[in-house]
Amino acid sequence: MKNKLLKHTLYICICIVISILIEVLYFNYNAIFNNIPSENIDFSTTTQDGNAVLNLNLDSQYINKLIINYDATKDIEYSLRYSSQDLFGEEKENIIKDIFDDSFNTSTTNIRNYVSKIAIEYASSEATNLNIRSLETDNDFQFNLTRAFSIFLVLILFYCLIVFYKNGFKTEKFHIYFAVVGTILGTIIILAQPSSTFYSYDDQIHFQNAVDLFSIGDTTYSVGEYHSTEANVANSAGRGSVNSIEEQQAQNNLFDSGSSTYSKTVKFAPTYNKIGYIPMSLGYHLAKFANLPFSICFKIGKFFNLLFYILLIAYTIKTIKIGKRLLAIIALLPTSIFLASEYSYDPAVFIGLTIFIAQLVNLYLDKNTKFDFKTAVILFASISYACFVKAIYVPFFLLTLLVPKEKFDTPKQARLVKAGTLALTILLSATFVLPTISGTMESDSRGGSTSVSGQLTSMLSHPTDYIKLLGNTAVAQFSDKVSQGFDDLSYIYNEAKRSSSNFFYILLILLLFVSITDNTGNSLSKKHRLSILIASLVTSLLIWTALYITFTPVGDNTINGVQSRYFLPLLFPLLICLQPKNIKNSINPRLYNTIILTIPVIINIITIFTSIVAVYSY
């Protein structure tokens, strides 16, 4: 035991040393060995096509960071264009979109390249709102603690994979492997991202709900809360303009500076659909109660959301009778880990529906599993948790009606459970249907000229036309929704300048391979497969319909607002239906488990470092 502890401690120390060496010798190579000085840069201003253009006077030279010192009376968008050589010596033009944020007076952009020319463009009409005081390069040595710690965590992650392999990489311990890998990957995301919103879907709304959940009475928002919620959605400091570790620090200094002038009265009204905010709200308010700076509180709220996701999915992987490894891979998709590390209630839906499906599958397959009180609580609580957040997943609850009668102690118990299932299904459906019919459900103004009552009237007046629209739209957009769903990092990709399909085919092949080969000898009957497929199809149609009602202009011939993440909870129930009865996996379990877990780990690391760490923490 002592030898193992000593060995692990030694490797951790080695990882620390290696991460420091990489940070110092690789990322600061030019500062140490080429001694390239930092300097002020002269520039000239011209106009072109209605834009003011700042041309920097420089020779072909290495620039690590470009610093623009300015004064702005409003947020002003600008483009930074620079020419550099690629690996083949060919000159290429690079374009970086950024903002002169009026909350700050310095913009720091990572170049990290030899450049021959740089031009900065912004609308000429904004000239009276902007004064460029000076431009300079920063080629000095910089020890970036966030980057170094991220590298350290990656080294620890690979060491864990080595330890798992040496210990046999046992299938029955896959929940532990998932928990370790998921926690490390999510932690890197949380640490590297700025402590603000507008990086994942609607996170400013989710963060505000998390802040308000445990707030009662007259509440004054802190500066960070004010800039990170819907309260100041139009002019949030740092929104879309944090592109370096220096700008992160400037934003943190502002957000940690105390209270804002914005206050509101928060009434304690615990509605059922707020249940998904409890983990992140609890973490945030505990940190706030401890008087920690906003930038730290913000990350702790995210970490609680991640931890809740990891613990419950790990529990599900441990207890489910089939598809352990398949569930782990789905839960480790870049989209899954990213959303679990954000202010988002999408993980709540995934957790609730996955636990429900796992418990139901155990009832279908395991002869020793009875429908006892514990099983009933897990089933009813998990599906309610998912549907309280988003009621459109309620069709899955009807699968409880297919539990074999021999699972119940008495016929009376079976009748009570089925009656309770129908009653709760109606109740959960009512949380969505009644507000829609009564007109109390609000449409989403972001969709344009939307109206719930108006859209319903249009649909009921032209039911055949809507059915055609629904079918045509779902079929036409199916491939896009699938291809965008595996490694979609929301608004992060706008900053990283890349699409969300870089690893789609690798992940698709991996998921199909694991769904077919993760076979323990048990598989669902045709009846159960068909029922799950029908529930998935009905839920998918409800997703499209819900967005047509709430997010699409009345009478429009398309359906707006449907995003791939809404279908992520359906992935596991759909793929377990593909598990064959007659195919036996003869691959060595240790080798098989190593391969299928290492692939998503590598993809996540590449995705996180190229799209998050390199964009926000360099």
Model-inferred region functions:
Residues 256-260, 433-519, 618:
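Membrane-lumen/periplasm interface segments of multi-pass, membrane-embedded glycan/lipid transferases
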Residues 359-368, 394-426:
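Perimembrane helix-loop-helix junctions
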Residues 338, 374-391, 396-402:
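Membrane-interface alpha helices of multi-pass inner-membrane proteins
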Residues 292-295, 314-335:
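Transmembrane-helix signature of polytopic, membrane-embedded enzymes
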Residues 1-32, 142-189, 417-424, 524-532, ...:
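Start-transfer (signal-anchor) and selected internal transmembrane alpha helices
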Residues 163-164, 299-322:
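Transmembrane-helix motifs of polytopic, lipid-linked glycan transferases
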Residues 216-300:
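Interfacial juxtamembrane loops and adjacent helix segments
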